[in-house]
């Protein structure tokens, strides 16, 4: 019996209209879907494409605690991959949903690493949060020979500072509880006035502003965009 195929589907940043046509079609056709969800409540990736999911679909839910340590999540990925493998061995295709793009800070990569050597895999790219945030602000990220760096806010200040110094365009993501510290860091290096804030990009409760407008209790799905290059078409 031929093995089933695993699809890693990017569901984009939040607005269902930003899901690609291919992703939507594959989700509509899926008999089995898998996705991550927090300890309690639905998964964000699933909520984005809820209208495309059929009523008789089998759902594999991997509930991952939102903690900094890796160990608890890895055992959950192990279990999730084993559940997916049962269907793949039976010749059934499985669609795994991942907000944004599956390979850009995407949880799908951990399942991919566990299954790619044994099963056929296809990945459908999704609109990244960085692209969505830039679009919401009408703000080009980089131009010509500029360099772009994407930084997770949990990094230590020294690491953030050194990477920011080398880049022309900067995106800082995963802000959440780190916002006060990041605000202080950017102020200390003279970039506060050049920093744009986006919360819940592409959604109905989207928040846009400058760093000064960003709440200290920022959503996890929020981002700061900075341009410190010299391209005249980007500088503002």
Annotate each predicted stretch with a short phrase.
Residues 1-16, 21-23, 28-119, 203, ...:
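Class I S-adenosyl-L-methionine
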Residues 6, 164-236:
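A contiguous loop/helix-start segment that scaffolds small-molecule binding in enzyme catalytic cores
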Residues 13-14, 38-40, 64-65, 127-129, ...:
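Short, acidic/turn-prone active-site loops that include or flank metal/cofactor-
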Residues 35-36, 61, 96-98, 123-126, ...:
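General beta-strand structural signal in soluble alpha/beta enzymes
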Residues 100-166, 215, 228-232:
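Class I SAM-dependent methyltransferase SAM-binding "motif I" and its flanking Rossmann-like core
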């Amino acid at each position: 019996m031929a093995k089933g195929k695993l699809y890693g589907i990017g569901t984009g940043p939040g607005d269902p209209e930003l899901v690609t046509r291919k992703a939507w079609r594959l989700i509509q056709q899926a008999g089995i879907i898998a996705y991550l969800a927090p300890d309690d409540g639905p998964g964000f990736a699933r909520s984005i494409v809820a209208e495309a999911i059929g009523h008789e679909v089998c759902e594999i839910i991997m509930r991952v605690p939102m903690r900094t340590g890796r160990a608890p999540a890895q055992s959950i990925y192990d279990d999730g991959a084993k559940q997916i493998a049962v269907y793949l061995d039976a010749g059934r295709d499985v669609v795994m949903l991942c907000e944004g793009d599956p390979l850009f800070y995407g949880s799908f990569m951990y399942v991919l690493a566990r299954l790619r050597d044994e099963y056929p895999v296809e990945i459908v790219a999704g609109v990244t949060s960085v692209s969505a945030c830039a679009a919401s602000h009408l703000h080009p990220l980089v131009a010509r020979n500029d360099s772009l760096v994407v930084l997770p806010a949990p990094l230590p200040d020294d690491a953030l500072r050194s990477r920011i110094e080398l880049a022309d365009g900067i995106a800082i993501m995963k802000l959440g509880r780190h916002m006060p510290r990041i605000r202080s860091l950017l102020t200390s290096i003279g970039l506060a006035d050049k920093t744009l804030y986006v919360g819940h990009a592409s959604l109905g409760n989207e928040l846009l502003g400058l760093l000064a407008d960003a709440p200290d209790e920022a959503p996890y799905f929020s981002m700061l965009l900075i341009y410190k290059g010299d391209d005249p078409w980007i500088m503002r």
